[in-house]
């Protein structure tokens, strides 16, 4: 039996992209009542927060001030979305 796949569309003002995801994976990750877009949004926010955190805190040399500002904004958005800091959510704090 073939795996059921869902297609989601990610849009900005001028561009869009389609993403195909496994329904079984979404079901595994979803908390009660969460929609597929909410699950994918949560995963995207975790991924983006992890990438900017690594770029600012775990890269060689001093981070660019613009990159630090992007991290600060991302972490604020993360906390708004999840009701906890990135450090609290991951157990990784500095």
What feature does the model see in each segment?
Residues 1-94:
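Acidic, polar-rich N-terminal leader regions of halophilic archaeal proteins
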